[in-house]
Amino acid sequence: MSAARESHPHGVKRSASPDDDLGSSNWEAADLGNEERKQKFLRLMGAGKKEHTGRLVIGDHKSTSHFRTGEEDKKINEELESQYQQSMDSKLSGRYRRHCGLGFSEVEDHDGEGDVAGDDDDNDDDSPDPESPDDSESDSESEKEESAEELQAAEHPDEVEDPKNKKDAKSNYKMMFVKSSGS
């Protein structure tokens, strides 16, 4: 151990050239075989620079390097606009969100009474509904009662004159409203 200290005295700077007796840090002199293996070793050690491997460079392909004409731009924009409008129309109409909770299904009357709950199945064409489902729930109860009375009057004009039937229609409507909104 004293021999190693004598060859490198304390406080003296070493020269820039590596010493021959420090073979463990001199990996450049190691015989790795051909140049390819040496490059692989350098790459694995993190010392080698990556070379271009021949893969496609972004923006350097002739199929993607052409520019669209004005007509193509207009056509693409029109298609995107129509798709956007279709999705917004279906979202705002609430056609796909008609369920009110678990186990709830709309009552469909086929015997000619119509929808007492005020659900318009006549407007199932492609035009969007002017009100969203949230807006229709915010209507006052008196307005809904009036609309139910008008529906009953239009469907059964002879029965509306009887006050007992009118009260029954109101109570039926209130019951349907309570069932559909309270889950």
From Swiss-Prot:
There is a cross-link at residues 13, 62, 75 (Glycyl lysine isopeptide (Lys-Gly) (interchain with G-Cter in SUMO2)). Transmembrane segments: none annotated. It holds the Pfam family SMAP. It comes from the Eukaryota. The modification N6-acetyllysine is found at residues 174, 179. The modification Phosphoserine is found at residues 15, 17, 63, 87, 127, 147. Residues 1-183 are annotated as: Disordered. Residues 106-149 have a biased composition (Acidic residues). Keywords: Acetylation, Isopeptide bond, Phosphoprotein, Ubl conjugation. Residues 48-78, 153-171 have a biased composition (Basic and acidic residues). Belongs to the SMAP family. This is Small acidic protein. It comes from Pongo abelii (Sumatran orangutan).
